[in-house]
Amino acid sequence: GGLNEVFADVADLTGKDNYLQLARRFSHREILDPLLEHEDRLTGKHANTQIPKVIGYKRIADLQGDEGWDDAARFFWETVVERRSISIGGNSVREHFHPSEDFSSMLTSEQGPETCNTYNMLRLTKMLYQTSADVHYMDKYERALYNHILSTIDPVQGGFVYFTPMRSGHYRVYSQPQTSFWCCVGSGMENHAKYGEMIYGHSEDELYVNLFIPSVLQWGKVRVEQLTGFPYEEATTLRLSCGKAKEFTVKFRVPEWSDASRMELTVNGTAQPVSASGGYVAVSRKWADGDEVRLTLPMSLRVSTLPDGSDNYSFMYGPVVLASR
């Protein structure tokens, strides 16, 4: 993290404004000022030095209600995600932001997107979503989670990945216990303990289902169990345990890769109308113990292009980037 975020956290914990003043003083104006003017001056800069700074700008904005700094953080996110990232949700070559109009180095370097970058971009994405509940943030969160973060741990030995090369037919290097303690090992340990943090969201009487991951949630007196084989299964089911009947709304995210018109929603096996609003399909009722609500998530094969418009493509099925073998 960045020092500005640390001091902002201390200010929040202690209630002392002098720490918030320090947080602003430790905010790097060379990066912040162009963002305030919606200018992208990131080319050539060390990527994971800048992302924690912006997390700090957002943290300060949240504590002080600073709309300008909040907007700067959003502009940075939009710039990196829409103009400087590839299909797996990662960014940077050899740890640095390359020219946004030229991704050729991304396709040839053995040092492609850095895991730490995506770790911190997911932290920023979480903060932005918590402010606005815009499903666009969750679409990008899901893409990076499944295609970059999930793939950065060795499923046998448990090593972690520093770089994910985008070179066709290339390989990745995993950390070794006695010889490798890169930055991406430290953040990597956190990555794989955080899969549950953005599955659900809530307001007073609304439960948001943002990610389709098998999980159990205790929401007040309501127990929610999500049952799914996603992404191998194109559906998810919620099983509710309420004790006493309770009225609330369940809102499922409509992913960018799915077609709301083809979705099917059932409650206890009975079809329900499917109407998407604000990026969510909602079902409101008085829920009873043992109720089940199931949503189908039709997937299709599609092509993802690079932001520079070059003739290079990734094939995706649903949210997942496909690989050949």
Question: How would you label these PLM feature ranges?
Answer:
Residues 1-325:
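Glycan-recognition and catalytic cores of secretory/periplasmic carbohydrate-active enzymes
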